[in-house]
Amino acid sequence: MNWIVTAGNLAASRLTKKPLLLASIEDLFFLQPVRIGDVVTVKAMVGYVGKTSLEAEVVVFCKPLHEEEKLCTRARMSFVSSDVHGKPVPIEQRIEPADEKEMKIYRYAKEIREGRLMRIAQRKQKVQDTNLEDIGQLSLRVYRLVFPEDAIYGNLMYGGKLLLILDEIMAIMAMKFAKGAIVTASLDALDFYHPIYVGNILVLATSLNYVGRSSMEIGVKVLAEDPVNNTVQHTCTAFSTCVKVDEHGRPR
């Protein structure tokens, strides 16, 4: 997922020429496993530009040795143009569809944006939701300090790095329960309510929410604690489906 966010960020930053923060990522499904030795191709484009945010699409293909290239996943995400302190700033550049194909991409990206705005209408209230009492009995709590190497713009934590950490923690939770190899099958739509800064203490409250025949749903609630100002913010909550697999990568 870090590669996906990085590709989207690169495409978006080449357009805006400004720092960008990952604001959200839509439902993400992995259609094909990526194995060691596969050739991975990542394509990214900007589909829509708003006042301070934009929509990006990333398509990932994988090509195993002696096989045809296959679609691995398609990700849609939004970025917010910001200053080094995390405050939104206007995007001066605009894009115009050149043909009917691009017009369809433009309209669909705009529809996704409008749907997400409805989803995050209560963002200010969700930032204050720092309760961890409801994370369940099968839980794992991890504390992590945000270092300068976790940021690429100023003192703001990079969204791709956070997704990498979340994927790792959810995999640990799934493996501890399943007692075997697992793969990430999907990630539910994820919205960021507040930036994370260098020096913050991340609280990652992980819980096992559901168990099926071969799959599990893992949830992680992320809080960012400022030890200097003694404040805690709810940054995001992620839900992922992990699947237990055998030595050939088949569900078991």
Located regions from the model:
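Domain-wide signal for the mature, well-folded portions of proteins, strongly enriched
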Residues: G8, D150-G154, M170-A171, V183, ...
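HotDog/MaoC-like acyl-thioester-processing domains
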Residues: R35-V39, K43, G47-L117, V198, ...
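Non-catalytic linker/capping segments at the edges of enzyme domains
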Residues: I91-I152
